[in-house]
Amino acid sequence: MAGKFSFSNFFGMTEDEDYSTDLQGTKTTDEVSPTSRPDNIISMTAAGNAKMNKIVLCEPRIYSDAKKVGKHLLENKAVIVNFTRIEGAQASRIIDFLTGTVFAINGEIQRVGEQIFLCTPPNYEIDGNLSDIIDQNDFDSEVN
Protein backbone atom coordinates (compact mmCIF):
# COMPACT_ATOMS: atom_id res chain seq x y z
CA MET A 1 0.00 0.00 0.00
CA ALA A 2 3.07 2.21 0.09
CA GLY A 3 2.90 2.89 -3.64
CA LYS A 4 -0.75 3.98 -3.71
CA PHE A 5 -1.93 7.49 -2.98
CA SER A 6 -4.75 7.60 -0.51
CA PHE A 7 -6.61 10.67 0.67
CA SER A 8 -7.21 9.17 4.07
CA ASN A 9 -3.46 8.62 4.50
CA PHE A 10 -2.74 12.12 3.26
CA PHE A 11 -5.06 13.72 5.81
CA GLY A 12 -4.00 11.36 8.60
CA MET A 13 -7.33 9.58 8.91
CA THR A 14 -5.88 6.08 9.09
CA GLU A 15 -3.79 4.66 11.88
CA ASP A 16 -0.32 3.52 10.99
CA GLU A 17 1.29 0.90 13.19
CA ASP A 18 4.74 2.15 12.21
CA TYR A 19 4.40 5.25 14.32
CA SER A 20 3.43 3.67 17.63
CA THR A 21 6.19 4.15 20.17
CA ASP A 22 6.68 3.42 23.80
CA LEU A 23 6.43 6.76 25.55
CA GLN A 24 7.47 5.40 28.94
CA GLY A 25 11.01 4.62 27.83
CA THR A 26 11.80 8.00 26.37
CA LYS A 27 12.83 11.01 28.35
CA THR A 28 12.74 14.45 26.94
CA THR A 29 14.63 17.27 28.52
CA ASP A 30 14.08 20.79 27.49
CA GLU A 31 17.21 22.75 28.12
CA VAL A 32 16.81 26.45 28.07
CA SER A 33 19.90 28.11 26.75
CA PRO A 34 20.42 31.71 27.73
CA THR A 35 20.14 33.96 24.73
CA SER A 36 21.22 37.52 24.50
CA ARG A 37 19.19 39.93 22.45
CA PRO A 38 21.38 42.86 21.51
CA ASP A 39 18.47 44.50 19.69
CA ASN A 40 16.82 45.22 23.05
CA ILE A 41 19.78 47.14 24.42
CA ILE A 42 19.61 50.92 24.22
CA SER A 43 22.64 53.09 24.76
CA MET A 44 22.24 55.62 27.55
CA THR A 45 23.92 58.29 25.45
CA ALA A 46 21.42 57.69 22.66
CA ALA A 47 18.55 58.07 25.11
CA GLY A 48 20.02 61.34 26.39
CA ASN A 49 20.35 62.76 22.89
CA ALA A 50 16.62 62.55 22.22
CA LYS A 51 15.30 65.48 20.23
CA MET A 52 13.48 67.99 22.41
CA ASN A 53 10.44 69.93 21.29
CA LYS A 54 10.90 73.68 21.09
CA ILE A 55 8.62 76.65 21.54
CA VAL A 56 9.66 79.75 19.61
CA LEU A 57 8.66 83.30 20.61
CA CYS A 58 8.01 85.70 17.71
CA GLU A 59 7.06 89.33 17.56
CA PRO A 60 6.39 90.18 13.90
CA ARG A 61 6.75 93.80 12.81
CA ILE A 62 5.98 93.40 9.10
CA TYR A 63 3.92 90.93 7.09
CA SER A 64 6.97 89.11 5.72
CA ASP A 65 7.83 87.97 9.26
CA ALA A 66 4.90 85.55 8.97
CA LYS A 67 7.05 83.39 6.69
CA LYS A 68 9.52 82.81 9.56
CA VAL A 69 6.68 81.69 11.80
CA GLY A 70 5.46 79.31 9.09
CA LYS A 71 8.94 77.79 8.75
CA HIS A 72 9.09 77.13 12.49
CA LEU A 73 5.73 75.36 12.30
CA LEU A 74 6.94 73.22 9.38
CA GLU A 75 9.95 72.26 11.53
CA ASN A 76 7.49 70.95 14.20
CA LYS A 77 8.15 73.83 16.59
CA ALA A 78 5.36 75.55 18.50
CA VAL A 79 5.28 79.33 18.11
CA ILE A 80 3.93 82.02 20.43
CA VAL A 81 3.22 85.12 18.35
CA ASN A 82 2.91 88.55 19.98
CA PHE A 83 1.15 91.19 17.85
CA THR A 84 1.58 94.20 20.17
CA ARG A 85 4.14 95.92 17.89
CA ILE A 86 2.22 95.73 14.62
CA GLU A 87 -0.83 97.50 13.21
CA GLY A 88 -4.21 95.79 13.43
CA ALA A 89 -4.62 95.30 9.66
CA GLN A 90 -1.16 93.72 9.32
CA ALA A 91 -1.79 91.52 12.36
CA SER A 92 -5.07 90.35 10.85
CA ARG A 93 -3.32 89.40 7.58
CA ILE A 94 -0.63 87.48 9.48
CA ILE A 95 -3.27 85.66 11.54
CA ASP A 96 -5.03 84.66 8.31
CA PHE A 97 -1.73 83.37 6.89
CA LEU A 98 -0.93 81.43 10.07
CA THR A 99 -4.44 79.98 10.23
CA GLY A 100 -3.95 78.60 6.72
CA THR A 101 -0.51 77.26 7.56
CA VAL A 102 -1.73 75.57 10.73
CA PHE A 103 -4.69 74.07 8.84
CA ALA A 104 -2.37 72.69 6.14
CA ILE A 105 -0.18 70.87 8.67
CA ASN A 106 -3.12 69.69 10.87
CA GLY A 107 -1.96 71.85 13.76
CA GLU A 108 -3.84 74.24 16.04
CA ILE A 109 -3.96 77.97 16.64
CA GLN A 110 -5.35 79.44 19.84
CA ARG A 111 -5.59 82.92 21.29
CA VAL A 112 -3.82 83.04 24.66
CA GLY A 113 -3.90 86.78 25.28
CA GLU A 114 -5.32 90.01 23.94
CA GLN A 115 -2.81 90.14 21.08
CA ILE A 116 -0.95 86.85 21.63
CA PHE A 117 -1.54 83.60 19.74
CA LEU A 118 -0.16 80.09 20.15
CA CYS A 119 0.40 78.12 16.94
CA THR A 120 1.26 74.43 17.31
CA PRO A 121 2.15 71.66 14.87
CA PRO A 122 0.31 68.32 15.10
CA ASN A 123 2.77 66.77 17.59
CA TYR A 124 1.62 69.22 20.32
CA GLU A 125 -1.64 69.14 22.22
CA ILE A 126 -3.28 72.27 23.61
CA ASP A 127 -5.32 71.48 26.70
CA GLY A 128 -7.71 73.93 28.30
CA ASN A 129 -8.97 77.35 27.37
CA LEU A 130 -7.00 80.27 28.75
CA SER A 131 -9.72 82.85 28.15
CA ASP A 132 -12.02 81.01 30.57
CA ILE A 133 -9.29 81.11 33.22
CA ILE A 134 -8.63 84.81 32.61
CA ASP A 135 -12.35 85.62 32.83
CA GLN A 136 -12.64 83.64 36.07
CA ASN A 137 -9.63 85.45 37.61
CA ASP A 138 -11.14 88.82 36.64
CA PHE A 139 -14.37 87.78 38.35
CA ASP A 140 -12.53 86.65 41.50
CA SER A 141 -10.63 89.95 41.76
CA GLU A 142 -13.88 91.94 41.48
CA VAL A 143 -15.51 89.94 44.29
CA ASN A 144 -12.63 90.46 46.76
From Swiss-Prot:
GO terms for biological process: division septum assembly; FtsZ-dependent cytokinesis. HAMAP family: SepF (MF_01197). The keyword rRNA processing does not apply. This is Cell division protein SepF. It comes from Latilactobacillus sakei subsp. sakei (strain 23K). Pfam families: SepF (PF04472). It is found in: Cytoplasm. Signal peptide: none annotated. Its main location: cytoplasm. Homodimer. Interacts with FtsZ. Keywords: Cell cycle, Cell division, Cytoplasm, Septation. It comes from the Bacteria. The keyword Transcription regulation does not apply. Cell division protein that is part of the divisome complex and is recruited early to the Z-ring. Probably stimulates Z-ring formation, perhaps through the cross-linking of FtsZ protofilaments. Its function overlaps with FtsA. Residues 21-40 are annotated as: Disordered. InterPro entries: Cell_div_SepF, Cell_div_SepF/SepF-rel, SepF-like_sf.
